[in-house]
């Protein structure tokens, strides 16, 4: 429970965060009911407020001004579910790590075959099967009960992930409205709904997305001073999801130990939470790997304490995250980065009453975002998914920055034009919030449309392969080899194959790194140590397949060819084109217009190649 002084400041702040007319209307509570009493600013008596509400004023509600838009928690939840289901259906798989490290092992758990990466080899044990079972168990029963097409299992899992994300966002929305005010909560809601980053990450089968769900839910619990629940959610995020997500919980730990001095609760719930999550996790992973395995410890050891670590997979400059942040959050990203400076300016020129929050000052409650950026910006190896856990915080900090700009604008205007006391800052500055919301929404929709248009071809192309199952040529007793060369990283996964008798095969290309291989047949396949796996990203000839044994071939024709990467579609004696879809050629396209779709302009400044699905003409083995 917040102290009386903080509670009084919060009540004043909540009143500040309404779009006040001269005659404020009764409004529903956060849960959509009308039982919540109107907030009374600190230092004001109810009878005086009632008299003011009964006095007619020019421009008030009696002239037909609309009620303020304050979505209830249930309304917000419905919009979140709608947005995340759209992501489940239309988002493409942006990261090959998601395909090979998660969708493929999940396919193995559900259907008994799939590709294995070196991270799942028992001698390394960097990935946890426990995390996969959260999706694998529902998918397994769905498959056994209804025997659906594999692609339906894929989209069922995605819808589950999207719904889980929406539940987190609902909880966080309520907490933000309580801690930071309804105006900021409303801005955050809009930014989340139209964020490209959330569109991509919310339904991604990645531990970093899982950590986003539970890490941000932990922050929401913390802002409500539900410390025990916050610790438990942080443990789930870090142990069952991504261990580096524990970084989000550091400000929570410091606040408990240094400000609250509640060592007993912290130690007690850390032990309870750790044991509750870690013990079953170790038991499950040990049974899969055939040896004692604690995957979170292994991945931390590999990334931090080995001599090579993740840098062998590529390094990027600091600008990578700056550009990536703008692509995923556009102007909201820029606003979030400048929040610390804007809070200082706000502190210097805006009266203190306008800066209140319920429980924590901004430098504590928002510290997880900037701590995360400080740590991950400094790492040479950068991936888009590394920022997933803080995506909702980017929207929140962007919303707070907009609110600060509104306060500063009103303060400056009130000094210059001598605005009378009692006028609310939102009456004169709401155009700033509307301008930011409209701009960010248009940029977000433009980016989402560009992503779907430019990069969705591999998923659509694999769906075409499902049509082959309905032809007389299909034989359920034959293994069909679907080959892929240089475009292996664009493969969306075995769930897109029409049946269990299709296999992905790799053709040798200019790529010289480690590729996955199929799990062995049999019940103990996850326990087998394969000699061809290594943790140095070195290629192994075992992964390559004989070109002459391919039944289908997936290839992107971008106009560049080598001896190992020929134009397969031109080999008309061997192949016929089943389907060809446009796929962006980045090097031949305008940088801005390929990133954001602009009607009447984009088509004239970008270039597509043909993403082809080829079927072998000549029969083999009598087929």
Swiss-Prot record:
UniProt note: phenotype after gene disruption: Imaginal disc cell proliferation is slowed resulting in smaller imaginal discs with aberrant architecture compared to wild type larvae of the same age. RNAi-mediated knockdown in gut progenitor cells results in increased intestinal stem cell mitotic proliferation.
Induction remarks: Down-regulated by bacterial infection in the gut.
Pathway assignment: Protein modification; protein glycosylation
Keyword entries, A-Z: Endoplasmic reticulum, Glycosyltransferase, Membrane, Transferase, Transmembrane, Transmembrane helix
Top-rank taxon: Eukaryota
Primary location recorded for the protein, binned into one broad class: endoplasmic reticulum
Record keyword Repeat present: no
Membrane topology note: Multi-pass membrane protein
Subcellular location: Endoplasmic reticulum membrane
Any GO MF annotation of the entry: dol-P-Man:Man(6)GlcNAc(2)-PP-Dol alpha-1,2-mannosyltransferase activity
Pfam families, per database record: Glyco_transf_22 (PF03901)
InterPro entries, sorted: GPI_mannosylTrfase (IPR005599)
Catalytic activity: an alpha-D-Man-(1->2)-alpha-D-Man-(1->2)-alpha-D-Man-(1->3)-[alpha-D-Man-(1->3)-alpha-D-Man-(1->6)]-beta-D-Man-(1->4)-beta-D-GlcNAc-(1->4)-alpha-D-GlcNAc-diphospho-di-trans,poly-cis-dolichol + a di-trans,poly-cis-dolichyl beta-D-mannosyl phosphate = an alpha-D-Man-(1->2)-alpha-D-Man-(1->2)-alpha-D-Man-(1->3)-[alpha-D-Man-(1->2)-alpha-D-Man-(1->3)-alpha-D-Man-(1->6)]-beta-D-Man-(1->4)-beta-D-GlcNAc-(1->4)-alpha-D-GlcNAc-diphospho-di-trans,poly-cis-dolichol + a di-trans,poly-cis-dolichyl phosphate + H(+); an alpha-D-Man-(1->2)-alpha-D-Man-(1->2)-alpha-D-Man-(1->3)-[alpha-D-Man-(1->2)-alpha-D-Man-(1->3)-[alpha-D-Man-(1->6)]-alpha-D-Man-(1->6)]-beta-D-Man-(1->4)-beta-D-GlcNAc-(1->4)-alpha-D-GlcNAc-diphospho-di-trans,poly-cis-dolichol + a di-trans,poly-cis-dolichyl beta-D-mannosyl phosphate = an alpha-D-Man-(1->2)-alpha-D-Man-(1->2)-alpha-D-Man-(1->3)-[alpha-D-Man-(1->2)-alpha-D-Man-(1->3)-[alpha-D-Man-(1->2)-alpha-D-Man-(1->6)]-alpha-D-Man-(1->6)]-beta-D-Man-(1->4)-beta-D-GlcNAc-(1->4)-alpha-D-GlcNAc-diphospho-di-trans,poly-cis-dolichol + a di-trans,poly-cis-dolichyl phosphate + H(+)
Protein's UniProt keywords contain Thylakoid: no
Its EC number(s): 2.4.1.259, 2.4.1.261
Single GO BP term: protein N-linked glycosylation
Annotated TM spans: 152-172, 193-223, 229-254, 266-284, 326-348, 360-378, 390-410, 431-452
Enzyme class: transferase
Family recorded in the similarity comment: Belongs to the glycosyltransferase 22 family.
Protein name as catalogued: Alpha-1,2-mannosyltransferase Alg9
């Amino acid at each position: 429970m917040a102290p009386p002084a903080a509670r009084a400041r919060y009540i004043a702040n909540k009143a500040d965060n309404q779009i006040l007319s001269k005659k404020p209307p009764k409004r529903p509570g956060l849960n959509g009911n009308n039982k919540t009493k109107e907030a009374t600013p600190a230092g004001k008596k109810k009878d005086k407020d009632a008299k003011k509400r009964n006095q007619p004023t020019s421009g008030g509600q009696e002239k037909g001004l609309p009620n303020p838009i304050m979505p209830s928690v249930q309304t917000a939840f419905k919009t979140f579910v709608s947005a995340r289901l759209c992501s489940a259906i239309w988002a493409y798989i942006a990261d090959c790590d998601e395909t090979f490290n998660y969708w493929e092992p999940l396919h193995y758990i559900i259907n008994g075959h799939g590709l294995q990466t070196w991270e799942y080899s028992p001698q390394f044990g960097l990935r946890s099967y426990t995390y996969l079972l959260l999706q694998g168990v529902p998918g397994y029963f769905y498959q056994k009960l209804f025997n659906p097409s594999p692609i339906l299992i894929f989209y069922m899992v995605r819808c589950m992930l999207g719904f889980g994300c929406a539940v987190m966002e609902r909880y966080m929305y309520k907490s933000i409205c309580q801690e930071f005010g309804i105006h900021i909560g409303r801005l955050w809601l809009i930014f989340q709904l139209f964020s490209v980053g959330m569109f991509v990450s919310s339904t991604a089968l990645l531990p970093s997305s899982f950590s986003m769900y539970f890490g941000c839910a932990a922050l929401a619990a913390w802002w409500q001073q539900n410390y025990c629940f916050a610790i438990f959610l942080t443990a789930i995020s870090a142990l069952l999801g991504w261990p580096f997500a524990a970084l989000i919980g550091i400000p929570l730990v410091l606040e408990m130990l240094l400000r609250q001095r509640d060592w007993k609760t912290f130690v007690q719930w850390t032990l309870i939470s750790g044991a509750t999550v870690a013990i079953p996790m170790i038991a499950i992973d040990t049974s899969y790997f055939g040896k004692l395995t604690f995957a979170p410890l292994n991945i931390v050891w590999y990334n931090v304490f080995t001599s090579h670590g993740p840098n062998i997979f590529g390094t990027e400059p600091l600008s990578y995250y700056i550009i990536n942040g703008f692509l995923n959050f556009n102007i909201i990203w820029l606003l979030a980065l400048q929040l610390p400076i804007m809070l200082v300016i706000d502190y210097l020129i805006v009266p203190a009453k306008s800066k209140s929050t319920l429980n924590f000052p901004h430098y504590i409650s928002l510290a997880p975002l900037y701590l995360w950026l400080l740590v991950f910006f400094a790492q040479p190896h950068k991936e888009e998914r590394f920022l997933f856990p803080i995506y909702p915080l980017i929207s929140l900090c962007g919303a707070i920055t907009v609110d600060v700009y509104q306060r500063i604008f009103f303060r400056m205007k009130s000094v210059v034009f001598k605005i009378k006391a009692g006028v609310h800052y939102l009456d004169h500055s709401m155009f700033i919030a509307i301008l930011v919301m409209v701009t960010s929404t248009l940029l977000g929709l433009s980016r989402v449309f560009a992503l779907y248009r430019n990069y969705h071809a591999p998923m659509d192309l694999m769906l075409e392969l499902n049509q082959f199952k309905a032809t007389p040529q299909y034989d359920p007793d034959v293994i069909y080899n679907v080959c892929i060369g240089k475009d292996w990283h664009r493969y969306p996964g075995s769930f897109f194959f029409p049946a269990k008798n299709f296999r992905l095969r790799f053709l040798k290309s200019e790529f010289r790194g480690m590729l996955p291989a199929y799990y062995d047949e049999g019940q103990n396949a996850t326990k087998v140590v394969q000699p061809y796996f290594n943790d140095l990203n070195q290629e192994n000839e075992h992964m390559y397949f004989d070109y002459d044994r391919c039944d289908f071939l997936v290839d992107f024709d971008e106009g560049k060819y080598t001896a190992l990467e020929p134009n397969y579609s031109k080999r008309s004696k061997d192949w016929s084109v089943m389907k060809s879809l446009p796929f962006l050629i980045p090097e031949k396209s305008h940088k801005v217009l390929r990133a954001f779709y602009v009607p009447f302009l984009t088509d004239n400044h970008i270039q597509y190649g043909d993403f082809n699905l080829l079927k072998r003409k000549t029969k083999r083995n009598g087929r």
